[in-house]
């Protein structure tokens, strides 16, 4: 975000080492926490990609294609994920390093010098002899289990149990307290996010979120 020029006047308190009575700082670049920082960064990286020959997607502005170098790219926040040949990826690496300070997380591929496992947005992606495997961010499941006080050793064999409406009317269920209701919504939302990568829990989570 710090590479994106500020689009409006934003004033901040000076740090202690630069403090001066009656003075403040005016941002020249965007700063985390300001309302338009994410938008300003989007404008910045789109200009960078387009100026280097990429075409922006129509259905999703976060998807890019470079026709000349046959590169596909997806941008999420400040994470860039690309698909292309070694030559094309080397070109992009030099191009973006000339513009920004970047951290290269890895290059997944079949060749001897390629990485066989990389972490992308806290998902683990591995290249194996059988194909590419994709593991969801396990932290979300661990947080849900911990907050519910569930023993992970006691697993269920099916995603849910159908309730007989004749045996269950809901009258014997006590409403959740305010704090419990907030916790339920938070955990259901977290599980809903996790279910995008965990098809085995998708149905159960959908049912949990229906009347949230």
Predicted regions mapped to residue ranges:
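Long, low-complexity, charge-biased intrinsically disordered regions
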Residues: 1-212
């Amino acid at each position: 975000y710090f590479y994106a020029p500020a689009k409006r006047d934003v004033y901040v308190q000076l740090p202690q080492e630069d403090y001066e009575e009656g003075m403040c700082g005016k941002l020249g670049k965007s700063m985390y926490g300001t309302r338009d920082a994410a938008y300003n960064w989007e404008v910045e990286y789109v200009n960078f990609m387009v100026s280097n020959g990429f075409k922006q997607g129509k259905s999703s502005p976060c998807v890019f294609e470079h026709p000349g170098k046959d590169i596909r790219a997806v941008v999420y926040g400040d994470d860039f994920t690309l698909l292309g040949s070694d030559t094309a990826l080397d070109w992009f690496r030099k191009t973006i390093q000339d513009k920004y300070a970047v951290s290269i997380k890895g290059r997944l591929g079949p060749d001897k010098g390629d990485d066989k496992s990389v972490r992308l947005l806290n998902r683990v992606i591995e290249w194996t002899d059988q194909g590419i495997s994709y593991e969801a961010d396990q932290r979300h499941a661990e947080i849900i289990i911990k907050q519910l006080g569930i023993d992970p050793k006691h697993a269920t064999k099916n995603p849910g149990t159908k309730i007989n409406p004749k045996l269950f009317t809901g009258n014997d269920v006590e409403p959740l307290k305010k704090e419990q209701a907030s916790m339920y919504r938070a955990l259901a939302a977290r599980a809903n996010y996790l279910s995008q990568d965990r098809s085995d829990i998708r149905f159960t989570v959908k049912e949990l979120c229906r009347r949230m």
